[in-house]
């Protein structure tokens, strides 16, 4: 398992709330919590930026992290990420924040310590552009959205 440096920005982590861990041996994501001063409601159509109480420094340029929504919040309550996916570069060292968007028609209550998103580490390959005049022909060519049909 890869070691990632973490700074605990909220003293409740490690006492009232655990450091994020994998729930099962097959888990890909670490749950991030709302480390706020008090509970609040996210109104329909509203977006809130929420502290997780952590910052990380990945350091390895072959890794990045993504903040993703928790499936239950989106499917059952209409709570998704305001930026859809948060990308954490390997050289970022600031606080991990979660942008939550209530796309439902009902207010949604966030309590202190609620699990609101998940952090997943992913491999990164940096690429350099090679300028060409033409591409080698493929079967797909420039077929884009819906090119392969529905069935």
UniProtKB/Swiss-Prot annotation:
Protein keywords: Hydrolase, Magnesium, Metal-binding, Nucleotide metabolism
Alphabetized CDD domains for the sequence: trimeric_dUTPase
Reported cofactor(s): Mg(2+)
GO molecular function, one term: magnesium ion binding
Superkingdom of the organism of origin: Bacteria
SUPFAM superfamilies with a match to the protein in the record: dUTPase-like
Pathway per the UniProt entry: Pyrimidine metabolism; dUMP biosynthesis; dUMP from dCTP (dUTP route): step 2/2
Annotated substrate binding sites: 70-72, 83, 87-89, 97
BP terms from Gene Ontology: dUMP biosynthetic process; dUTP catabolic process
Catalytic activity: dUTP + H2O = dUMP + diphosphate + H(+)
InterPro entries tied to this protein: dUTPase, dUTPase-like, dUTPase-like_sf, dUTPase_trimeric
E.C. numbers: 3.6.1.23
Function: This enzyme is involved in nucleotide metabolism: it produces dUMP, the immediate precursor of thymidine nucleotides and it decreases the intracellular concentration of dUTP so that uracil cannot be incorporated into DNA.
NCBIfam families assigned: dut, PRK00601.1
Family: Belongs to the dUTPase family.
Designated name of the protein: Deoxyuridine 5'-triphosphate nucleotidohydrolase
Native species: Histophilus somni (strain 2336)
Organism taxonomic ancestry: Bacteria, Pseudomonadati, Pseudomonadota, Gammaproteobacteria, Pasteurellales
């Amino acid at each position: 398992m890869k070691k990632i440096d973490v700074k605990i920005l909220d003293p409740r982590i490690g006492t009232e709330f655990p450091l994020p861990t994998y729930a099962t041996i097959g888990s890909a994501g670490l749950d991030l919590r709302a480390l706020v001063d008090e509970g609040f409601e996210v109104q329909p159509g509203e977006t809130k930026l929420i502290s997780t109480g952590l910052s990380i420094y990945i350091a390895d340029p072959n890794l990045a992290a993504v903040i993703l929504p928790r499936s239950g919040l989106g499917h059952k309550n209409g709570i998704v990420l305001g930026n859809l996916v948060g990308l954490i570069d390997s050289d970022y060292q600031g606080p991990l924040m979660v942008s939550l968007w209530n796309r439902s028609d009902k207010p949604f209550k966030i309590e202190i310590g609620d699990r609101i998103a998940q952090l997943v580490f992913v491999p990164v390959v940096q690429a350099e552009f090679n300028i060409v005049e033409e591409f080698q022909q493929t079967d797909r060519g420039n077929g884009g959205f819906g090119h392969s049909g529905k069935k």
